[in-house]
């Protein structure tokens, strides 16, 4: 009786990885990740009015951040505070979608998760307002004093 070699027996336990088995690598993987990211942004735009409003605000504030006479670090803080709101809104929307996928019934834990997501968006908005107020407030005050 001939016994199979260890390489043969291990290959039967786990089939060898073949190209095209659903796993992508390299640039192709990055391309598909970007496509999924785009799909998430489009779905959130379509389903969430708050996200649409925040994107409209970002479209106004981001160019202003790059036109303000501030340091590079302050410019990054201004832009990051705007993008933070969008990031947290995307995460909040994903939490809400996952909970709604599980069940539309009211449940204390589902409500708590949605409330925490909403609170996170509020905290991000407060960070944005504080950042813009601290950096741009003095500049706005100087401009108003000079022109009024």
Where in the sequence are the language-model features?
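Hydrophobic alpha-helical transmembrane segments
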Residues: 1-35, 39-40, 46-86, 90-94, ...
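Residue-level signal for inorganic ion chemistry
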Residues: 41, 96, 113
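Amphipathic, cytosolic membrane-interfacial segments at TM-TM junctions
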Residues: 100-116
């Amino acid at each position: 009786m001939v016994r199979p070699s260890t390489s043969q027996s291990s290959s039967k336990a786990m089939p060898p990885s073949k190209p095209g088995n659903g796993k992508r690598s390299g640039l192709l993987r990055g391309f598909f990740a970007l496509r999924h990211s785009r799909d998430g942004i489009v779905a959130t735009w379509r389903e969430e009015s708050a996200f649409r409003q925040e994107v409209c605000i970002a479209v106004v504030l981001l160019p202003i951040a790059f036109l303000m006479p501030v340091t590079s670090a302050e410019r990054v803080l201004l832009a990051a505070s705007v993008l933070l709101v969008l990031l947290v809104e995307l995460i909040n929307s994903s939490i809400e979608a996952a909970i709604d996928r599980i069940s539309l019934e009211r449940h204390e834990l589902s409500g708590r998760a949605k409330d925490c997501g909403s609170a996170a968006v509020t905290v991000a908005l407060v960070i944005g307002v504080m950042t813009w107020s601290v950096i741009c407030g003095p500049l706005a005050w100087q401009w108003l004093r000079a022109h009024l």
